[in-house]
Design a protein with these regions (language model features):
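Conserved catalytic core of the tyrosine transesterase superfamily
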Residues: 1-210
Length: 210
């Protein structure tokens, strides 16, 4: 009885996601991409512009974006039309095209920093030989998104990864191509990642006539 009287109740554990919006983060719309890109250009944020454009074009996970090395995209001193990066999660290489504006942004960034092959493309506060952390990258993404009037809680690093993949799927309906571009091993993963519903599939089917 005495033990029951003196017993103190355990503090209630606060759920990690309390007050946070969870679930899949939606892709950015083209107008949002252009707004962020324009703002970064006007503000002269060369690193952020190069990173944002690379994230959109590459469709890489955040952990792979921050691990990009100069030689991955600019082995010859100038940014190439195509690049190949080995994914940390799967160990599989994934190839992607780099648009002209992305190549220009990366070249401008390389000129301003003097970075050379053999170095990390994006470094953080831990020193020139250490990559930016995924947490730092996530904070940057939130900053970019909030700077154009969007709610950072609704979007995240995966929003950038999904953006171009979603546009490609909506315009072509080619799920296999999107699977390859995202580096997924199973097409079911791509279906879930894009949030494809039966209605979406049927709408695409109606456009195909044989």
């Amino acid at each position: 009885m005495q033990d029951q009287v003196n017993a103190t109740p355990e503090p209630r554990r606060v759920p990690w996601n309390k007050g946070k919006l969870t679930g899949a983060k939606p892709p950015l719309r083209p107008k949002h991409v252009w707004s962020i890109r324009t703002k970064l250009q006007i503000e002269g944020r060369a690193r952020d512009l190069a990173m944002f454009n690379l994230a959109i074009d590459s469709k890489l996970r955040g952990c792979d974006v921050v691990a990009i090395r100069v030689e991955d995209v600019a082995a010859g001193g100038y940014t190439a039309d195509r690049a190949t990066v080995r994914q940390k999660k799967t160990g599989r290489p994934v190839r992607f095209e780099l648009s002209e504006q992305t190549r220009q942004a990366v070249d401008d960034y390389l000129r301003s920093t003097g970075k050379r092959p053999g170095e990390l493309l994006f470094t953080g506060r831990r020193g020139p030989d250490r990559s930016m952390t995924t947490r730092q990258y996530a904070r940057l993404v939130s900053n970019w998104i909030g700077s154009v009037g969007l709610d950072p809680r609704l979007f995240g690093t995966h929003s950038l990864r999904r953006t171009k993949a979603t546009l490609i799927y909506r315009r072509t309906g080619n799920l296999r191509a999107v699977q390859l571009l995202l580096g997924h091993t199973k097409i079911e993963s791509t279906v879930r990642y894009l949030g494809i519903e039966v209605d979406d599939a049927l709408a695409i089917t109606k456009q195909v006539d044989v």
